[in-house]
Swiss-Prot record:
Organism: Albidiferax ferrireducens (strain ATCC BAA-621 / DSM 15236 / T118)
Job of this protein: Exhibits a very high intrinsic GTPase hydrolysis rate. Involved in the addition of a carboxymethylaminomethyl (cmnm) group at the wobble position (U34) of certain tRNAs, forming tRNA-cmnm(5)s(2)U34.
Keywords: Cytoplasm, GTP-binding, Hydrolase, Magnesium, Metal-binding, Nucleotide-binding, Potassium, tRNA processing
Name assigned to this protein: tRNA modification GTPase MnmE
Signal peptide: none
Cofactor(s) the record lists: K(+)
Amino acid sequence: MSLPRHQDPIVAIATAPGRGAVGIVRVSGKSIGSLMQALLGRQLRAREATYLPFLDRSQLAIDQGIALYFPAPHSFTGEDVLELQAHGGPVVLQLLLARCLEAGAELDPVSQMPRLVGLRPALPGEFSERAFLNDKIDLAQAEAIADLIDASTEAAARSASRSLSGAFSQEIHILREALIHLRMLVEATLDFPEEEIDFLRQADARGQLSDLQQSLQSVLQKASQGALLREGITVVIAGQPNVGKSSLLNALAGAELAIVTPIAGTTRDKVQQTIQIEGVPVHVIDTAGLRDSDDVIEKIGIARTWDVIEAADAVLFLHDLTRKNATDYIAADAVIAEAIAGKLSASVPVIEIWNKADVIDRPCQQAGLQLSAKTGAGLDTLRRKLLELVGWQSKPEGVYMARERHVQALHRTAAHLMTAGFHLEAKAQALDLLAEELRLAQNALGEITGDFSSDDLLGVIFSRFCIGK
């Protein structure tokens, strides 16, 4: 799994671009003592913060700050790591980065060899990749680092921190250990068919498989909740012109984002805003009103409306209570409803909403949720309904931050275990097929933590990190 580039020493600015009080330049590699001497004029004691000048080639100070040295293997990457904490100006940090690269290429006065052969700028995520390759963290923990940085809600940050601490990985490890034990029983039965010992019956293989499936479902439920916290849901507001779609977006967002006028066709293109409901990011999209139109620009907007509807996790089909008895309005709504149903899979919920409840004198018996985007009446009910339909349990305390690939791997594991159960229950047990399904289930779990991963998968994952992590 290790590539030639993984042997190179690397350096990068580890703090976000822009001005700040403190900026960090991080170096990782093997035997960085000579580089330390060139940059700092001395060797550092391990894991001890030292305040001193950072020197250029002429031994003049570029800046003064704190230096920290973490010798291998007791560092984030598992290699020797040097961190320079300087003032956070972009020019200062670029000078320090350039000085590190320059010093790495300089000849050591004693050995007459470059101080740090091959020192180069780090690729995005390369420090975390080194930590993974050197068994300091597993793949799920590495991804949790990026998720913690990108967290947009408190619930997302806490669940990412939980995954980074190893809680999610520990659950996967327990599942894999149970799978390995079950595989051992099946392999023993296959390898010693002449023995008069029924390994599977004696060890209650059926019971073990059932327990494993139940544990897997518990982990899958928590991971699915974590995926909601990370990915959020995309909700599209759709309906005829002038039913209050833009007003509903503004009401949900608590801000005047979309233009609202009595003129039909005001919204020509989608308007998107991300809001939070119980810590879940909800990406709400206001769209052009659906109708037949001869206006070229409006027709483009309507086409885009159908595009976003097809990609939605949920659709809010908005109606106008004040026109509920108008024949032409009802007919147009029926056409739209049929078209929406044809665009979506059965798993995508469509919430029927009747707006302008504030205009109606008395309660209406119309089916669906009634609200007023103008007064806010009914919005809390809509928020709860949305989370309920996408499966949110409102208990983020035990949730792990998970990605869609984690959830899919868990689903594949469940499918393999189900097939394994069929083979186990069959009158003529196909033990070789049972063993294969258990092996595939174990591999699927291994993809989550990196125990079973291709180099291509690793490349995609770490390339999405920021530089310096």
